[in-house]
Structure formats: structure tokens, C-alpha cells
Design a protein with these regions (language model features):
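Hydrophobic "anchor" residues on beta-strands that sit immediately upstream
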Residues: 60, 94, 130
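Conserved core segment of the aminotransferase class I/II
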Residues: 118-199
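PLP-dependent enzyme catalytic core of the Aspartate aminotransferase-like
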Residues: 125, 248, 262-306
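Conserved glycine-rich beta-strand-loop-beta hairpin in the small C-terminal domain of fold type I
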Residues: 192-206, 218-233, 247
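Helix N-cap motif at beta-to-alpha junctions
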Residues: 235-239, 278-280
Length: 306
């Protein structure tokens, strides 16, 4: 296959809502992005199969399979198996399996993610997937270590390219991480400390949402068992207005459409909430302001319709 840069037309499938930095990479390189709606089981696999198996310009799909950013979905076993059994029209199609939140549990009763590579090996499709993760939200963002998993063929290809980019890796940083975490048990123990900080914050926001918006019919939201985000869908056509009202009241949110390619939410309804940084007291105040703005925006829309 020719390098993607020498091919005229490239497409990537983008589960939505999804991760803005994934979409930003495609945008920088001029790769056309195609929205694939998320379901409670993961991406709409019937749509994924239709695109991948029939269009040889579809070269990849972005996936955050555990606690997806931003809706917190963990892909079901059936979804993972359907990924492994894709029959791409393009020989150079790849699944970009970004398992960024693989140990970021907020609950003891957390979902299990089937191993995609194991499923691919069963059907001989292991060249189709590139799996990766990092300690960005475990140790230090931008100063952690990263890992990649793929077939020998893909690894040989990647090593040849990386060898031209760097002479060596930051061995001292790798050593720091090994000495600090030591092993899998060390990582898990450390993540319990993260959970102790994060879960009360998630609970505070979700509790306020229930208190202020239950039964109002103006918003639905996720209650994730892990990850870093709460995804809120307000009334269609209201997300940008909610964010504008919040800003006027002193609460800054991520921009409308951030979880969609080209920052264009076709229904203008999704808002990503990241409750990790503020104190619980600040979160409770901000969540109340947010719910009030949801009510105001919904009221404006309903009045305008009449």
C-alpha cells in the first residue's frame, strides 16, 4: 500500500461523542471524518461494518474502548468481537484502540473489557489493530510513559519509523515510573487514591443533576463507572446557549461541539463535564448554576417555539 500521505482521499470513522484530540489529528492532516453514533454497547457496529467493509477509502477508526471519552461507555464483548471480525475493503485499514482509561475505575463493580488482540488472533486479523495507552492520567500528563501493542508486522514497521525520530527514549523517566509503581498491584493501589479524590466529585455533580433536573425532560446524563467525564445531552439546539449562559454566570465549560469532528454537534445538545479539578464545594455550586442554565435555555427554546 502507498503511504496515506500519497493517497488522494482518506476517511476515518469517528465514534461520537468522542475525543477532540483524536479528531484534531485527522483535521490537521486533512482526513475526512465520518460520525458514528455511540450506543450503550459502543459504536454503532452495523454502521462501522457498512463503511469499513465496503469503502476502501476508510483507513481507520478511533476507539476509546473503556470508559469512552466523554460518555463513559465500555465496549461490550459482542462489539469487540465484531471489531475483530471486520473485513476491510482497504488493506491498510487500522483500528486505533486508545485504551486511555484502562485502570481508571470509580467503582469496585466495574465492567470488563474483552481483549481485542486475543479476539483478532482467533480470526487472523491481528494486523488490523494498534493498541496504545499511557500514564497521562495516572502519573503526570505529558510527562508519563506510553505503551503500544500490535502484531509483529506492525511493530517492525513502527520501530523502523521511530528509529529515525529518536536515538533513545527517556530512560530516567521510565526508571522513575518502574521504581514508583513497581508492578500491576502498585498501579492498582495508586489508582485507588485517584478514585478517593474523583468519586466524591462525580457523586456531587450527579447528585445535583438528579436534585435539580429529574423529571424535567430537559437533559439526560451519564453516570460512569470510570474515566474522567460526565456526558450531558440537553435539549436539541441548546448546548451552545447553556455554555454561553454558564459563562455569563462565571462557570466556564468546554466549548459546544468539542466532542464532535470539526466542533460541529449536528444536534447542538452534547456538553462534556470534567469534574476532576474543582473542590467538591465549588462543583456543587457550579453544578447548580449549570442546571439553572439548562432550565433557562430549555425555557427559551420552548417559548420561541410557541
Amino acid at each position: 500500500e502507498k503511504p496515506w500521505g500519497q493517497q488522494k482521499k482518506l476517511k476515518f470513522l469517528c465514534p461520537v461523542p468522542g475525543y477532540d484530540r483524536h479528531f484534531g489529528i485527522c483535521e490537521v492532516f486533512g482526513i475526512q471524518m465520518i460520525n458514528v453514533p455511540m450506543t450503550p454497547e459502543g459504536p454503532d457496529m452495523t454502521l462501522v461494518e457498512s463503511w469499513v467493509n465496503n469503502d476502501d477509502t476508510v483507513k481507520g477508526i478511533w476507539c476509546v474502548p473503556q470508559y469512552a471519552n466523554p460518555d463513559g461507555t465500555t465496549y461490550s464483548d459482542e462489539t469487540v468481537r465484531r471489531f475483530a471480525n471486520l473485513k476491510p475493503a482497504a488493506g491498510d485499514f487500522r483500528i486505533f484502540w486508545d485504551n486511555a482509561y484502562c485502570v481508571h475505575h470509580l467503582d469496585d463493580d466495574h465492567p470488563h473489557l474483552l481483549n481485542l488482540m486475543d479476539e483478532c488472533k482467533k480470526v487472523g486479523s491481528e494486523d488490523m489493530v494498534v493498541m496504545f495507552c499511557s500514564t497521562s492520567k495516572i502519573s503526570f500528563s505529558g510527562a508519563g510513559v506510553a505503551a503500544i501493542g500490535c502484531s509483529k508486522r506492525n511493530m517492525d514497521h513502527l520501530k523502523a519509523k521511530v528509529a529515525m525520530q529518536t536515538i533513545s527514549f527517556d530512560k530516567l523517566n521510565q526508571l522513575r515510573h518502574v521504581r514508583f509503581f513497581k508492578n500491576k498491584a502498585g498501579v492498582e493501589a495508586h489508582m485507588l487514591k485517584h478514585r478517593a479524590l474523583l468519586k466524591p466529585r462525580f457523586d456531587a455533580v450527579i447528585r445535583t443533576f438528579h436534585e435539580e433536573m429529574d423529571g424535567a425532560g430537559i437533559a439526560v446524563w451519564t453516570e460512569p463507572k470510570g474515566g474522567y467525564f460526565i456526558s450531558v445531552d440537553v435539549m436539541d439546539g441548546c448546548a451552545a446557549r447553556v455554555i454561553e449562559l454558564c459563562k455569563e454566570a462565571g462557570v466556564t465549560l468546554t466549548g459546544a461541539g468539542c466532542a464532535y469532528p470539526y466542533h460541529k454537534d449536528p444536534r447542538d445538545r452534547n456538553i462534556r463535564i470534567a469534574p476532576s479539578y474543582p473542590s467538591i464545594e465549588e462543583l456543587e455550586k457550579a453544578a447548580k448554576i449549570f442546571t439553572l442554565c439548562c432550565k433557562l435555555a430549555a425555557t427559551e427554546k420552548l417559548l420561541a417555539a410557541n
